[in-house]
Amino acid sequence: MDRKMKIKIVVVTFFLLLFIGAGSYFFTSLNTRGKAAGINLFSLVPSDCSAIFETNDLASLLRELKGKSYGKELTTHGFSLIAKDLIDHFEELTASAPSGLSLRMNKLLISFHSPGTEMDQVLYFPINPGDEKWIEEQIQKKRPIDFPLKSVLYKGKKINICPMGGDLFLCYYKSSGFVAVSYSKRLIEQVIDAHISGNSVLTDKVFGFAKDTKTANGIASLYVKEKQTGWNYLNLKFDDDAINLSGITTDAETSSSFVNAIKEQSPIEPFSGNIFPSSTYYMNQLSISQIQYIAVNSAQTEYDLASYGDDVKATDIQLMYFLKGNVAGSLAGFSFCSDDSIQRPFSLLCIPMQNSMKAEADLRLFMQNRSIKTESTAGGKIQLFYTGNRSYRFYSLPPSTIFSQLSGIKDADLNTYALFYKDKLLLAPDPVSALSYINQIEKGNIIEKDSIYKKNISHVDTHFNSLLMTDLGKLALYPEYRSRLIPDFFSQHMSFFSNFILLNQLVCRDRKVYPNLIFIYKDEK
């Protein structure tokens, strides 16, 4: 971006911050007179939003972030233009604000929308009804001559548009009690629709429950909508080297929901680090006790079984039945880098067996029955592969989505190879992945020896219902291996979170599921 463009953005951003300052001033002024406008900012948020950020004290939040090692990430990565503007120019606003202007940001929302670019947000803040004229005067007084302020009507409501050069336009809509600002005219139109029709995010009963369950009075909150867990309310806490988000899930009570599957599971303990190669950058652990629920949920989200034939569906069902009868406790899905950095990463499922001999006999019987029923030689083959001086018996399974469903990898194909190694069943998309894993383990190249891993795993509860740990920077390098178990909101903003390690735990207590996300900053200087 050239210097002229940056100057233009600073000027228009200054208007935005003046609006916010004015909003805080008038809100404070209104309190002293005894009655505020009472606008519920959530009633303006379009119902299709993916996340909502809320703070009642932006000034304190920015001061706290300024002292954190990861604070600079907010301005150096394309997370949100609106958020970046607020952070970049807050001190400038403080120095230039009119005398007596309150800088305590009392109520502020930012809603996030698809497709998740840095312009797909809307900022909302309250103002005192009747003081819109003051805001207009500030705009006219500070507006550069070469930036004519435009306006258009949408359903009888005026949208003000300020061209910022290039393809950037700052749009805002003001009405009695509030102002909404965005770099997207489309989103401002959706705000108007929600305001007129009343069809806002508050009409979502699950979101309403999430909002009602808010108990913490932290400096900021985040409401995140996920396909697997519904609306999550998360309270934000900022440590020196980590961002902590903890709260509660509010998924609807449906028999096939992921959250309700977790409610039926017994807590599990984390696997030892000696089963993961030292180059592992992604791992997840799930209980197998309610594997049918997990499979149904996965099928209904990213990897829709409806696009496959009856043979694939039948194979999935029978493999799930086989696993439930043989698995001991929980399973782990993980991805690790090869010794050759040029090669793609490898992904596997590692599943402890109750009795490996019985499990292998059951798998042979399953493959034999599938071949007879389908009258096909596709899959169902036994092959020998060698590594070093040892041979390993691989079972080439019939086409199935089982690997994708349980590993969480979005783009996994239907080929799955099974191998019994020690007391575990390994499932992989190809024999090379499994053999590479065995080579790493046999050489003693395990993550248990890594000091950073030990530090990160120390944040994990001793008992949980599911766990995901990943280096988001490495995960971003291989989008085809992106996991559906990463919350959508954070996947959409991977450029910001790429300098963090993510720990995502779900813990069930008294049939309520509590998510705990920890973003550990990787200060690699």
Regions found by a protein language model. Give the residues of each.
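Exposed, polar/acidic Ser/Thr-rich sequence context and nearby capping/turn residues
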Residues: 38, 442-443, 525
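Short beta-strand-to-coil "C-cap" segments at the C-terminal boundary of structured domains/repeats
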Residues: 248-253, 518-525
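Short, Lys/Arg-enriched, disordered terminal segments
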Residues: 1-8, 524-525
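Structural boundary/hinge residues at secondary-structure and domain interfaces
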Residues: 6-12, 16-161, 207-227, 244-346, ...
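C-terminal regions of mature proteins
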Residues: 498-522
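Active-site proximal loops enriched in glycine and acidic residues that flank catalytic Cys/His/Asp
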Residues: 285-288, 351-353, 428-430, 441, ...
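Extracellular/lumenal glycan-associated surfaces
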Residues: 126, 184, 346-347, 351-355, ...
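An internal, short helix-loop-strand segment that often contains or flanks glycine-aspartate motifs
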Residues: 73-106, 143-248, 261, 265-273, ...
